[in-house]
């Protein structure tokens, strides 16, 4: 029995002697890391501690909390639920902005606003002098739309920062969230107003200062001041402009607004390009008159001219023989708008887009030719044919695409490369920064309508990809 005890003691001593050097070495390594951290002022992470694979496994999204925030934000609306109407500089818009700024502050971000109400929330990195990595979207909503368009990219960005903070990640480059002013053209007829100004549009800044008014003849400056912005006494908006290279990269998380991801059962869309959009305003003037007293041969009907042009838009788009060419008559208004009065004036607003800029411009040219032909044929006056904007397409940056695709793969999420056919603030951010977009599925591709919906799971997947991509880019 004694011999057995001596044998077991010998084995125990041998095991202790083998394990002790490894334990001491690990302790010495930890002490060395702490010493280097104290000396440098920066965290020195152990190998793999914040490697992207390990970080991917530690990302935890508060999906119910994000959904609750989206629901709460949707209550700031001038339309009854489930519709959302949130127009630039209205009381509901101001309240919604206040709500988002509070969420940014709760996330520990430094919050600031510029002269037109672009809102910025920054998480300072370990090297704050480096250009930051930015992300964001918009929260304004066209009349009677849904609660996810743009909002997922703002509230999802705040949650992405919270996700990274909960994981223990420390960014090298600062991370900044941008809430863009007026991505929708609802009030002043200008899409992506805030991001256009950030990209340095002098023409827009001058127009906003001097000529731009809304449907009630309220000037942009008056409206901005009513919401607490544009306080410069000279109405100078150039302070909004950002220099090229202000950001290392810009990312936008967004619902797809189309059915492809849902139809194909995919989690993530990695956007490679944004289609080239253009918008037109057209007006015809006729002689009007009584609907019963003026016989058909004597009419110069501005309403029928508008109707004929609307059909011509469809015809010219289809003539391109490309699935990527689209055209929409989104507004058609008749004056005086009475059932027993022949329209004396008509107003159309036309949207046309394509991934091929030259092909889109050909469609615009044909629409203008048709407008002139219709005016002559119907003996009405083409009083306005105005190209409001005619923007080029934007390509996503190759490095940003690579990082987004890597993030999706490391998170075991299915993804595909795809084109964005809708307007986004990213189109203009691409003029000052490398850009990329992350799409998530939405129910039946619905958007700009109350049925717009993205599931908490799909939003959480998007937030994870955004978080991991931000982390990757912040360490570059």
UniProtKB/Swiss-Prot annotation:
Changing residue 257 to N does what? Strongly reduced substrate affinity and enzyme activity
Sites binding Mn(2+) 1 sit at 138, 149, 254
> Could you tell me what this protein does?
Involved in the catabolism of purine nucleotides. Can use (S)-ureidoglycolate as substrate, but not (R)-ureidoglycolate or allantoate. The sequential activity of AAH, UGLYAH and UAH allows a complete purine breakdown without the intermediate generation of urea.
Q: Which GO terms describe its biological process?
A: allantoin catabolic process; purine nucleobase catabolic process; ureide catabolic process
Task: Enumerate the residues binding substrate.
Answer: 183-184, 254-257, 290, 340, 353, 423-424, 448
Where in or outside the cell? Endoplasmic reticulum
Give the source's domain of life in one word: Eukaryota
Please tell me where this protein is predominantly located: endoplasmic reticulum
As given in the record, the signal peptide range reads 1-25
User: What happens when you mutate residue 257 to A/E?
Assistant: Impaired enzyme activity
Impact reported for residue 340 to A: Strongly reduced substrate affinity and abolished enzyme activity
Q: Which residues bind Mn(2+) 2?
A: 149, 184, 448
Q: What happens when the gene is disrupted?
A: No visible phenotype under normal growth conditions, but mutant plants show a slight reduction of growth on a medium containing allantoin as the sole nitrogen source and accumulate ureidoglycolate.
Annotated pathway: Nitrogen metabolism; (S)-allantoin degradation; glyoxylate from (S)-ureidoglycolate: step 1/1
- Keyword check for Hydrolase, yes or no: yes
Write out the entry's keywords from A to Z: Endoplasmic reticulum, Hydrolase, Manganese, Metal-binding, Purine metabolism, Signal
Which protein is depicted? Answer: Ureidoglycolate hydrolase
Residues at the site labelled Necessary for dimerization: 299
